[in-house]
């Protein structure tokens, strides 16, 4: 359902309304999720090993090493091998949901940082027994838990008064931008401190256009600022922003913001803003047209003269 709606007056009589909604179809039915589709090809993930039978027993003292891997079709490519002596281990598997190399793990803490914009996911495998020297252990049936919320923006131009949206870019600012994922309890904790991430579109050309997905840290009762720069009817508009308060984003859920642009004062066509008085209607063709200025007038055949 709808979380919050805010309306804001804008320049040239072009108003902006933002509403943030939850998408039930994008919600997982289990704690561990392959929602959004199975993990994409070329996604990099890391396996960190601790000589502990349980995740609760993990510490920097029993750290045993890490390996980096990348999905490639039905196989896994090794970027950095994880080699372990005989023993019982807990594996922490994590990924930021992209193909980029993950920053080297230093074992300064049994945790890793996460920020808005990252599709952070984890899998914990405890009690792994490595029994034979020289053997290979296969870590199968990995099902990642998604810790962030998936999010996108839909920009909407007013039908009948505006042309298509042909360019769009924006930002989203939230009160919590950074978080820490703890290996010992498999939880992500966000810290206070605002931050901004980009929202992008791929060659938009329609009256309503969806952005690419990005990912946001879970947060409750948050003030979220959406700012857009876009082109409507070949007319550019910059720094159009609105702030919604009381927004809640839950992990492993999908949300979207509808950003609607409307006007009652004219028409945005051909790179210009036309006053209402510029519009005329031709009865023979049953079509509307726009005069090049507000000095030209027209009247119905049975109307009195204007002057």
PLM regions: where:
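Eukaryotic nuclear/nucleolar intrinsically disordered, charge-dense low-complexity regions
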Residues: 296-303
